[in-house]
Amino acid sequence: MGFKMGIVGLPNVGKSTLFNALTRTAAAQAANFPFCTIEPNVGEVAVPDARLFKLADLAKSKQVIPTRMTFVDIAGLVKGASKGEGLGNQFLANIREVDAIAHVLRCFEDGDVTHVEGRVDPVADAETIETELMLADIESIEKRLQNIVRKVRGGDKEAVQQERLMKAALVALEDGQPARVVNVEEEDLKAWKMLQLLTTKPVLYVCNVGEAEAAEGNDHSQEVAVMAAAQGNAHVIISAQIEEEISQLEDDEAAMFLDEMGLAEAGLDRLIQAGYDLLHLETYFTVGPKEARAWTIRQGTTAPKAAGVIHGDFEKGFIRAETIAYSDFVTLGGEQAAKESGKMRAEGKGYVVKDGDVMHFLFNT
């Protein structure tokens, strides 16, 4: 599976410019005007992974199919969004559908680009959106609690669990903390996810800096880094303008441009890696003469579940997984050599897939 990340931010912080660059499309109207993004724009990008191309080269695969990441450019919001101000209602509905939130913060100075609050203060911007999400969660819980309490009185065991979790979330939210700070036990995780609280989603702060500051960041991005560390969230420094420029270049030209800017890799690569880390994701590969393909799974996924990402029948009829570590596959020069060297393992249902595993699944139909 891939994963879906919602790109959010106050108007005119550069989020639509970033989205356009990442998806290599101009679908979003990145104009200097509040609420220019009226409906969510959805775009998929290939996840860059040099390992996949190395495997394809060794296996002489005819086709290379990377795994993909979905970005959703969600309409900008302002203070009062939880009450429907600005484009708040659309924002709140769309953000519930994503796995994580990439919160674009304006960390650049530019007198030609207006700020909805009339100042550049990324920490305050982050607090504005977090507050709106917390207020929306409070309202959602309070509305549902009335019905849950009635079910509890009627002896509904699931309702008892839901009431306990809702009240725990409400305590945190009313204390000014997002619901993600609540310590949830393993047996409560399913019910917790069903609450669909906005502030349970992991957050990645995207510091949008000027071109000259893309390599090292600036004082604004440093403030965000301190805030993110205190919250246990992640952050990444990107120049949306640079990403927009290199999205129009051929790969070799883009590499030269990045080198001139003192950047080791594109912002897209850093953003995706940060997203992977945030959601505890990893990649395994299937490789053969026909195709080399990357698949995304969550860390801790067992072999049958990983097989199910390809097709449900693979999981249902799982027998075993012939597995080669990426390093062994590459070092030894391919599948046959790895097999002859005893590096191909037969893994059963309890095997936890490791990042980079090259796998072939055997299953009953």
Spans of features found by a protein language model:
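C-terminal-of-GTPase-core extension/linker across diverse P-loop GTPases
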Residues: 2-8, 13, 19, 147-354, ...
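Switch/coupling subdomain of P-loop NTPase systems
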Residues: 96, 100-103, 108-136, 140-143, ...
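Short, glycine/charged-enriched secondary-structure capping and boundary segments
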Residues: 22, 84-87, 116-119, 218-222, ...
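Conserved nucleotide-binding/hydrolysis micro-motifs of P-loop NTPases
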Residues: 25, 51-52, 76-78, 106-112, ...
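Amphipathic alpha-helical transducer elements in NTP-driven molecular machines
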Residues: 35, 49-52, 65-71, 85-99, ...
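Glycine-rich, flexible loop/turn motifs
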Residues: 26-34, 41-43, 51-54, 83, ...
